[in-house]
Amino acid sequence: MTADTGGHIRYLMGLVGASEQDPTVERITIATRAFRGFLGDEYWQTRETVTPKIEIVRFPTAQPGYLPKEELWREVPSFADAVIEWIENQPKRPDILHAHYADAGVVAAIVRERLGIPFVFTSHSLGRVKLDAFTRSSGEAMTDAAESLEHRLAAEERALADAALVIASSRDEAEIQYAGYDSYAPGKIRVVPPGSDLTMFTSARSSIAVDRMINRFLDDPDKPPILAIARPVTKKNLIAMVEAFGESPELQNRANLVLIAGSRTDIDDLEPELADNLTRILKTIDRYDLYGKVAYPKGHRPEDLPGLYAYARERRGIFVNPAFNEPFGLTLLEAAAVGIPVIATDSGGPNDIVEVCGNGVLVDATVPRSIADAALDILRSPALWHKYAASGAAAVKAYDWKAHAKRYHGLMRSILSTPSTEPARPAQLLITDIDNTLVGDEAAHAQFCRWLARQNGVGFGIASGRSFHSAMMVLEQEGSPRPEVMITSVGAEIYYLTGDSTTYVGDDEWAKIIDVNWDPDAVNEILGTEPGVHPQAELEQRRFKVSYLTDGDKGLRRRLQEKFAAEGLQCTVTHSHGRYLDILPVRASKGAAVIHVRRRYGLSEDQVFVSGDSANDTEMLRTLPQAIVVQNFTDDMANLPELAHAYFASTGYAAGIIEGVEHFKNRAVTPAV
């Protein structure tokens, strides 16, 4: 039992509750460890029926007593033996296992090895992230519980290596956190954010109890509150909130700070980590003399939570999540559903939530000043506050357990389908951009899906500026066909669908080709001297792609090409939508990647179709003769001489793709006169 246990159980029960609604799911068994101890005899009960479809089965291990999670790794062998014995005695074996957390991943790997049952792995949190966060906050290597952490890292490596599929909560987890592991295989990871039941937050109102809880601390309770809700553990970084507030006289003048830091009776009775962090918070409040400006109630009831968010909304406040890393970010969704702008760490799930909902900003939470600056930007602008507050309603629709279960079950069914040895090579290949080409119009997209299903021998692929996981998230959310080839990060990476029709494998040959003479450090040094150019978040940087945001300078691309040439750097420069700047190795681009794929498949130029809508598609479109520009194009593409050969469709989005392909097909069969 830890301070995280309630959230973990809430997630698991939300997942199985949504899963049991699927009529194709016959039975769900939650396998956990049986133990005796202070929590009562119910945890020694062998079997517990939750619903007609859901059961909990508890397995005894070598040590019958309660154990803290750091010591559970010693019980893995006996737990695995017990699970295997139970499975072998069942009238029907489970079709698939889903392992949650590192130790369960090893158990599932043992079951797979002995019984051949595939498994899916969800880490929820990673040992390397914990180690990095501790080192960053203390400046020291982590020595306590070192043996446990060593086993955890080894367990995570094995789970990653042996799982049929890995489910991550966020792009940050999939692309940054897992990347530090030897067994990292990005094509085997899918980002499927957890669902959330936000109904109690959408109509939340403050209450007299909540008002009393907070206002008794404040000299001026009508000021907008800067609200944070988190347990006072180190990784939640609540101290940064107090430092940001204490260092900004303007923020103190404009707002109050409200810290809901768990519940306590006596600080001395708390776990050492919680007690130490609360003591630091109180000392920092005292150091900055913030009395009358900061509320830090001793506790709250679960039913108070919606009212706490509503308290902030009613006073035009802001919700802040300053964690070093946030695996998902449920509190951000709760705040969004209530209608409060958010400021969140740029490490973890908040990247995806803010992108989907558009309800706030991301900051480097290790720099308290960045939190204060972001808060002041919102507080100074009523229009910006309203924009972020109104945008949060998207959270209710986007993060829902029903939608989660639909994607989750689709992946499970795909994993369990009979695998082929190797996907057949297509006779023709269609490669399209995603945003505002394949997707952007629901009716056109649905028409495209029906049309593609009838195109025998036509392979389907995408070429996007998005990363692999970002692209896959959009495709799966939109219900797009699964591509056979994915050219991502503006051509810096190529992935191919494997024989299981679910996971992908990266093109290592392509990586070697484009790596020649690539010097990203030198590129960044030059960009650092360019006015109006700012790096995109860490999540958008790739091994072979340096990404920046710009102020729309139309001469920027040519100027940078000249600067790179003067320094002997050969790079591909794309500047699209007047805002997004990507620098890649000279051999990397969408067009070059399409040519590489074409040759790998043994196709001629007239067997490949490409389509797009913006400047970052131009190089691909000019490279291939059968190029399609959809009607809703941008960046003055109709006047580009290099696209004189392209077909400009009269219809937009995916309908324009269909129109273009049919145009080239008809031209190929029409005899010359």
Task: For the regions a language model picked out, list residue spans one by one.
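Short beta-strand scaffold positions
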Residues: 99, 121, 168-169, 344, ...
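Receiver (REC) domain switch/active-site residues of two-component response regulators
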Residues: 164-165, 484, 625, 646
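Mg2+-dependent phosphoryl-transfer enzymes with acidic/Ser/Thr/Gly-rich catalytic loops
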Residues: 584, 591-673
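Asp-based phosphoryl-transfer active-site loop
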Residues: 426-443, 621
